Amino acid sequence: MFDFMTLEKVQERGPLVHNITNIVVANDSANGLLAIGASPIMASAKQEMDELAKMADVLVINIGMLDGELVEAMKIAGRAANFAETQVVLDPVGVGATSYRRKVVQELLAEIQFAAIRGNAGELAAIAGEAWEAKGVDAGVGSADVLAIAEKVAKEWNTVVIISGEVDVISDGTRFAKVANGSALLPRITGSGCLLSAVCGSFIAVQDDVFRASVEACVSYAVASEYAEMELERKLPGSFRPLFLDALASWSVEKTRAKAKILESGEHK
């Protein structure tokens, strides 16, 4: 099912990825998208959202830094993208951390149809209404079944859910996959999850099967991080960051297939 050819489609087509994101990660997200062959646009003015929806191949909404004006822009952009039949991805950064974030995400989910939602276990648990001890924008700790959370949110919101962690879990409510690739250094650089959301968006833009696109994006991204770590003399985040960008720029179907670790995939019982 997963041949990782979506990666080549991204390189061939260069999808335009409209990002409404936060200032902490905007630069790395843009450079990461350029590295894989996509074309990023980082725009958040509500006055241009309707026009951008007609131009972009996918919209990625990231709630990392919120204010009222930005939330309004997100809603306008999401509705316009839905009208234009442009896929939309949500990264609910830190949704479990504050009541304001939870309120905003519930409003976004109510007004916009998302093709995919990507976050950590704590963020998706908050959306699912499951008990979880959030730690700011980090995953925190909890005992709930991550696969069950993914299935629940996917079914409730008719979307594909991508839960990042030591093992990534992807579900569309019917099908699921577990991915065990990835460098331990990824969580040590700010914005690695946000960039993954943007990368997932670029794959979704060129692949009709959103579940397949999401799995292949997660594997390809994680495998690139492993190749970057192999180049390190010392396993430090400052050295890893530019090597990871280089690994994204030089990734290939062959490299991904050689190291892909899909632990399990199939249909929910």
UniProtKB/Swiss-Prot annotation:
One of its GO terms (molecular function) is hydroxyethylthiazole kinase activity. Keywords: ATP-binding, Kinase, Magnesium, Metal-binding, Nucleotide-binding, Thiamine biosynthesis, Transferase. One of its GO terms (biological process) is thiamine biosynthetic process. The keyword Manganese does not apply. It comes from the Bacteria. Substrate binds at residues 42, 191. Pathway: Cofactor biosynthesis; thiamine diphosphate biosynthesis; 4-methyl-5-(2-phosphoethyl)-thiazole from 5-(2-hydroxyethyl)-4-methylthiazole: step 1/1. Its EC number is 2.7.1.50. InterPro entries: Hyethyz_kinase, Ribokinase-like. The keyword Acyltransferase does not apply. It catalyses: 5-(2-hydroxyethyl)-4-methylthiazole + ATP = 4-methyl-5-(2-phosphooxyethyl)-thiazole + ADP + H(+). Its cofactor is Mg(2+). Catalyzes the phosphorylation of the hydroxyl group of 4-methyl-5-beta-hydroxyethylthiazole (THZ). Belongs to the Thz kinase family. This is Hydroxyethylthiazole kinase. It comes from Listeria welshimeri serovar 6b (strain ATCC 35897 / DSM 20650 / CCUG 15529 / CIP 8149 / NCTC 11857 / SLCC 5334 / V8).
